[in-house]
Amino acid sequence: MAIKMRLARAGAKKKPFYQIVIADVRSRRDGRFIENVGTYDPNQNPAAVKFEEGKALEWLGKGAQPTDTVKQMLKTAGLWEKFTTKPA
């Protein structure tokens, strides 16, 4: 079972809001997901990105592959560096 960390759209028409979720690659964009690990609100200026750090790092450690957009968000939040640096 391949797992992705990706965006799931929520919110009203013309007012998008996204949840950052862990989902099976076979499920639809806004369909079934395993766990919610954060949010992204592009309506705020600047756009608000919030991660639950423990959950996000746990799923990355389990092998969840982030999409390109989520990977950039992880880098901006500083979580990608925490994941890629291995303790000595």
Curated annotation (Swiss-Prot):
GO biological process: translation
Pfam family, one: Ribosomal_S16
InterPro entries: Ribosomal_bS16 (IPR000307), Ribosomal_bS16_CS (IPR020592), Ribosomal_bS16_dom_sf (IPR023803)
Record's keyword annotation contains Oxidoreductase: no
Ribosomal protein is among the record's keywords: yes
Any coiled-coil regions, as ranges: none
MF GO annotations: structural constituent of ribosome
Sorted UniProt keywords: Ribonucleoprotein, Ribosomal protein
GO cellular component: cytoplasm; small ribosomal subunit
UniProt-listed HAMAP family: Ribosomal_bS16 (MF_00385)
Protein family according to the UniProt entry: Belongs to the bacterial ribosomal protein bS16 family.
Name of the protein described by the UniProt record: Small ribosomal subunit protein bS16
Native source organism of the sequence: Geobacter metallireducens (strain ATCC 53774 / DSM 7210 / GS-15)
Gene coding for it: rpsP
